[in-house]
């Protein structure tokens, strides 16, 4: 199995990579290759004997999503994002990274699927920020999104995009 992790140099990306290396498999299938991407150079995981392509790349840059999709990972973990505070301070950067980068990835997958049926499993990390406040506990699946920040809005839009692209 070939696994790609976008946002691999971040805390969650590093922990996910370590856990996958420790487990050695995902869904009962052995992991043979990692493609690790982040705007900062990700480190190759210690203790992994398979192939690793670790590279610095900005998924909101033209062509980057297509390059990832060309290597046909079986599973793509999309963890990359500009967090709430930074997305509020730099409106354009928040939308470029959080929305455009995600849309480029989904569109590259859609186009590849149209060519040869490529259909990876995509795991997208959202945020509690999509719900706004106040929140019930626990938050039920059908709870409506009412984001109060640009970051929450961007994540909510990406959830809708994922749902729409998944139908295609």
What does each model-found stretch correspond to?
Residues 1-26:
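N-terminal Rossmann NAD(P)H-binding glycine-rich loop of SDR-like oxidoreductase domains
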Residues 48-61:
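Rossmann-fold cofactor-recognition segment
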Residues 59-97:
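NAD(P)H-binding glycine-rich loop region in Rossmannoid oxidoreductase-like domains
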Residues 93-104, 145, 153-154:
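Glycine-rich NAD(P)-binding loop of the Rossmann-fold in SDR/ketoreductase-type enzymes
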Residues 103-149:
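Conserved Rossmann-fold NAD(P)-dependent oxidoreductase catalytic core, especially the SDR/UDP-sugar
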């Amino acid at each position: 199995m070939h696994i790609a992790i976008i946002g691999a140099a971040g805390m969650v990306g590093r922990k996910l990579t370590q856990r996958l290396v420790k487990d050695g498999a995902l869904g009962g299938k052995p992991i043979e290759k990692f493609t690790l991407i982040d705007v900062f150079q990700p480190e190759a995981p210690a203790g992994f004997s398979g192939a690793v392509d670790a590279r610095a790349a900005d998924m909101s840059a033209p062509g980057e999503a297509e390059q990832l999709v060309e290597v046909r990972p079986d599973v793509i973990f999309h963890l990359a994002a500009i967090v709430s505070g930074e997305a509020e301070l730099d409106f354009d950067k928040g939308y470029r990274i959080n929305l455009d980068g995600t849309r480029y990835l989904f569109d590259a997958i859609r186009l590849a699927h149209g060519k040869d049926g490529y259909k990876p499993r995509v795991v997208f990390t959202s945020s509690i920020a999509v719900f706004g406040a106040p929140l019930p506990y626990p938050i039920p699946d059908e709870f409506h999104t009412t984001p109060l920040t640009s970051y929450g809005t961007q994540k909510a839009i990406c959830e809708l995009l994922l749902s729409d692209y998944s139908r295609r």
